[in-house]
Every structure is written in C-alpha cells, then in structure tokens.
Amino acid sequence: MAELLQAEAELWCHAFGYLKSMALQCAIKLGIPNAIHHCGGTASLPELHAALPVAASKRPCVSRIMTFLAVSGIFRQEIPVDGEAVVGVRYSLTPASRLLVDDDNSVSSSQHTCLSQFMLLCCSPLHFRASQSLADWLRDDEGDAAAAETPFMMANGASLYGLACRDTEFGARFSEGMSSDSRFVAEILARSSCAPVFAGLTSLVDVGGGDGTTARAIARAYPHMRCSVLELPQVVDAELADVGAVEFIAGDMMEYIPPADAVLLKV
C-alpha cells in the first residue's frame, strides 16, 4: 500500500511540474526579485504587498505563491522561531533569484547579467503548446513535412527562428532573451578558471552565436584565438559583420559548419 501511495505521489509531481515554471514566470512578471532587492535583500509580506502590482483583493494569495517559490528554491523563507503570525515571515534572495534582479543600480548588476528575459522566453506559451503537441506530432505520418518538422512547428506554424523573423515584437523579446543568456555565459567563459578549456586552441566557431556576445568575450579574454560566429543570414547584418575581433559567417549549421579547432554550441 505504501508503495502505491508513493507511486501516486510521483505521478502528481510529474502532472503538476509545470507549476514551477508558471510560478517562476509570475515572480518575474510581478518583479518580486527586484522588490526584495530594493528592500535590502529581505522583505516581509506587507513590504511585498506595498511594492508589487497586486490587486488588494488578491494579496492573500501572495504568501501562497511565495511559499511555493521558496520550496522550489527560488526564494528563501525565514519563519520566526517565536511563532509570530504569517506577516512576520520574511523572504530573501537565493543565488537563483539574484540572477533575476535587473536593477541597473544594484550591486549585483555589476557582478552578473540578469536572466529574467531569458527565463520569460523559456516559459513562453509557445514552448508549452509545442510540448502538448508531442504525442500528435509522433503519431502524424501524413502531414506536410515542412509544416510538421518539429512539435514546435506543428503547434505554432513556424520554427522558433521563423517566428522571431516574422513577428517583430516576439523577435525583439527573443533577441534580448538569447543575448542575456549569452552575456551570462560569456562572463563565465572569460574567467581564468576556464582557461584550461581553451588551452592550445587557435580558432573557434560559435554556432548559432547570435550577436556575437559570447565570441567577443572569448576573443577579448584570449586574443590569440581567431573567433567566428555562424548564424542565419537574417541574423547577420552589416552592423554585426563590422565588429572587428569576430568574423560573422552567414549560413545554416544543418548544412555547413566552418572549420576550426573547436566548435561552441550553447544550449
């Protein structure tokens, strides 16, 4: 009996796993990480109520969302040991939520790149629609191959890059999200602790490297290395092509990857 109950609990965890993504999206959209940061790194419920754009009638729900996010590891929940009421609970940032602070005047902004826009991109309904189409896509054997090449294309009518090119608003969000992640990765790769990874390399091609943020950071950290970026033609424009330290190559990685000592493929 205990084994069956445990099995059911595991199924519940899988079935409602999407709530973690939705709670994270909610926290970013409401600006909870910034609100806690502006309160000095720790905030009470009344302070969050005052700082967040939440309707007064919905404020009782904030504590539930914060508890869920604390259990998920996004925030840290500090409950007073003297048994005070819920209003005495305080919330603070964790290493994960510090990456979601986008205040330009914050100390953290000089230490890392904010990943809020990238996380919102990952939590986009576009991806959830695609995941819900997975079974239909696997069963489909009669559809147009071009239209149903991936579950994402079946659900949204175009590839992710196709949507970014067709919808200027989404394209801007996509570019900002990918750029923020590239800036974060670039900061890590440029540190001396990563030097052994690049030892002996004289050339590197960043496949799908976007605006070249990562490649430029590597080129600055390792000036002896010839760095290039392979991107789709619609991404590579005259402005990107003239950045000096990095060469931009227009092409499709599914068809051709320029020769180099190393290939960087960020996922």
List the model feature ranges, each with a label:
Residues 263-265:
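A conserved beta-strand element that flanks and buttresses the S-adenosyl-L-methionine
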Residues 198, 257-260:
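A short, aliphatic-rich alpha-helical micro-motif
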Residues 201-256:
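Class I SAM-dependent methyltransferase SAM/SAH-binding core
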Residues 2, 7-203:
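Conserved Class I S-adenosyl-L-methionine-dependent methyltransferase catalytic core
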Residues 43, 247-250, 267:
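Short, low-complexity, polar/charged sequence segments that are solvent-exposed and flexible
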